[in-house]
Amino acid sequence: MSFEQKPKVTVILANLGTPDEATVPAVRRFLKQFLSDPRVIEIPKFIWWIILNLFVLPFRPKRVAHAYASVWSTDSPMREIVFEQTQRVQAYLERENKQFDLTVLPAMTYGNPGIDAVLEKLATNPQEHVILLPLFPQYSATSTAPLYDAFAKWIPTQRNLPGLTIIKDYYQHPMFIQALAESVLAYQEQHGKPEKLLMSFHGIPQPYADKGDPYADRCRITAKLVAEALHLKDDEWAISFQSRFGKQEWVKPYTDQLLQDWAKQGVKSVQVLSPAFSADCLETLEELAIQNAELFQQAGGGSYAYIPALNSDQAHIDLLAGLVQANLDALTHTLAHR
């Protein structure tokens, strides 16, 4: 299929974000932007402003900056990985779609390159179509929805709007499940099989789930499908949720408590996979890989290992590009018949 002039299509791969540097000022700026989003913290604005500015931002950035410094190389691990994913998805899609003038851009909800800045670039270079792929396998109002909000804010400011596709999530896509299962098998081929495989997901407050956020249920489906793909028995794996913040109840079971319980029950070897993350970041590299290893071993456990996120594995690139390609195929058909 060919067109008189190649239609311009932009694909945006968007992740949560990261500070610009592993320094206290940079981390404070990032946390302020992130924790000021009412999608993330559902507390009355005035009350949360007091808590954030008087009790969180004066103290938390120092500890978080120290944690970032422990995993930082030339840049944030997440940003480096998202940039590599973007380049490889671009190469894949360019090979398969000569009919489009195609660009793939990275974006972050918080920090740089910010989604708002990416959308402003599109305003000066009108597109036929924009495809947004949030790099969150399981939709949540706390992670994916802020990207919808960014588009909702941008759309009223534009005159010549593009067509828009948002890929909501892919928590049970067969290619996603297979890629996760293969990553576990590849790791275990080198390091052996543990007594327990723990699939740990970032948590959300229980009240958010009670109000209709489908995230926790989608995490459970992902975990169950991965366990089935690996032919695991019920006592060989578990699901848990990490990174709770504040005093309210979050979705359970909690990763740290489950690991301590396993250690006390005599479990000697654990491997941890986090299918909520498309790119390794502070939470996986520092909290899951280091903090939780110490927690498990101090409670009497033995071997503990974190299995890396899919990152830029070829199976992951094939998945991400395939999700976009399905929409490009539909767009090709639509443009050819209008």
UniProtKB/Swiss-Prot annotation:
One of its GO terms (biological process) is heme biosynthetic process. Its EC number is 4.98.1.1. It catalyses: heme b + 2 H(+) = protoporphyrin IX + Fe(2+). CDD domains: Ferrochelatase_C, Ferrochelatase_N. It is found in: Cytoplasm. Pathway: Porphyrin-containing compound metabolism; protoheme biosynthesis; protoheme from protoporphyrin-IX: step 1/1. One of its GO terms (molecular function) is ferrochelatase activity. Gene3D superfamilies: 3.40.50.1400. It holds the Pfam family Ferrochelatase. Fe cation binds at H202, E283. InterPro entries: Ferrochelatase, Ferrochelatase_AS, Ferrochelatase_C, Ferrochelatase_N. It comes from the Bacteria. It is an enzyme of class 4 (lyase). GO terms for cellular component: cytoplasm. Keywords: Cytoplasm, Heme biosynthesis, Iron, Lyase, Metal-binding, Porphyrin biosynthesis. PANTHER family: FERROCHELATASE, FERROCHELATASE, MITOCHONDRIAL. NCBIfam families: hemH. Belongs to the ferrochelatase family. Catalyzes the ferrous insertion into protoporphyrin IX. HAMAP family: Ferrochelatase (MF_00323). This is Ferrochelatase. The lineage of its organism: Bacteria, Pseudomonadati, Pseudomonadota, Gammaproteobacteria, Moraxellales. The gene is hemH.
